[in-house]
């Protein structure tokens, strides 16, 4: 460090070198999360992405509060206070909507910060819930050798002949029911089915009558 307290050129270069490795790892992780963080690609990466998104609200609010308490200037203090209030209101709204969705479905996917739509599919005596990123009036189910995919997401094993006749899409304010309108088999335990919206209302996801034999097979 120079006599006047400023950093020398060599010290700045050394600091950049030290942080360059850390930032390269951080940006690599961000790239992986953004590119593969979709439920149709990798559920593990998607859950990690949701965890990061969930932490951004309190982190943003904490930074804004810190900037408001220790401001650079009066204008920055005012702006930081406004940003902290906006973060708090949006975070509170997120929790309100998530709790409403949880009360409707009983699924922890309700606290997914990326989407407030949940696809509920009754399979084998239970209900499999997945986040639905894109809202649509119809959903396509594809069964390939006894493995079910809907909206590009894996739902586990399901025989084509045992596809449900009705599925639901839950939102904080409404539950949308979709019924099977068309199906076509194309091989052994394989086929395609299309579900289309036919009613909606302010009610909970219907309970599933447990099929003990199928539940044991899926366990």
Curated annotation (Swiss-Prot):
Molecular function via GO: structural constituent of virion
Keywords: Glycoprotein, Host Golgi apparatus, Host membrane, Host-virus interaction, Membrane, Transmembrane, Transmembrane helix, Viral envelope protein, Viral immunoevasion, Viral matrix protein, Virion
PROSITE patterns in the cross-refs: COV_M
Pfam families: CoV_M (PF01635)
Main localization category: virion
Lyase listed as a keyword: no
Compartmental location: Virion membrane; Host Golgi apparatus membrane
Intravirion-side positions: 40-49, 100-219
Keyword Transmembrane helix attributed: yes
Recorded GO CC terms: host cell Golgi membrane; membrane; viral envelope; virion membrane
Transmembrane segments: 19-39, 50-70, 79-99
Function comment: Component of the viral envelope that plays a central role in virus morphogenesis and assembly via its interactions with other viral proteins.
Family stated for the protein in its record: Belongs to the betacoronaviruses M protein family.
Quaternary data: Homomultimer. Interacts with envelope E protein in the budding compartment of the host cell, which is located between endoplasmic reticulum and the Golgi complex. Forms a complex with HE and S proteins. Interacts with nucleocapsid N protein. This interaction probably participates in RNA packaging into the virus.
This protein's name: Membrane protein
Native source organism of the sequence: Bat coronavirus HKU4
Lineage of source species: Viruses, Riboviria, Orthornavirae, Pisuviricota, Pisoniviricetes
């Amino acid at each position: 460090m120079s006599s006047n307290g400023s950093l020398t050129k060599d010290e700045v270069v050394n600091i950049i070198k030290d942080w360059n490795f850390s930032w390269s790892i951080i940006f690599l992780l961000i790239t992986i999360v953004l590119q593969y963080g979709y439920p149709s690609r990798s559920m593990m990466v998607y859950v990690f992405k949701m965890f990061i998104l969930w932490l951004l609200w309190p982190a943003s609010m904490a930074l804004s509060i810190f900037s408001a308490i220790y401001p650079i200037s009066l204008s920055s203090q005012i702006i930081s206070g406004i940003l902290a209030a906006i973060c708090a209101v949006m975070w509170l709204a997120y929790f309100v909507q998530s709790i409403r969705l949880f009360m409707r479905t009983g699924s922890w996917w309700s606290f997914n910060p990326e989407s407030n739509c949940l696809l509920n599919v009754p399979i084998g005596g239970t209900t499999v819930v997945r986040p639905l990123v894109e809202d649509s009036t119809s959903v396509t189910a594809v069964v390939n050798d006894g493995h079910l995919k809907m909206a590009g997401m894996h739902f586990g094993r399901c025989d084509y002949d045992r596809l449900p006749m009705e599925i639901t899409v839950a939102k904080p304010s409404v539950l949308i029911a979709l019924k099977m309108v068309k199906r076509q088999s194309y091989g052994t335990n394989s086929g395609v089915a299309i579900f289309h919206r036919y009613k909606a209302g302010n009610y909970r996801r219907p309970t599933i009558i447990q099929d003990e034999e199928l539940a044991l097979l899926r366990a």
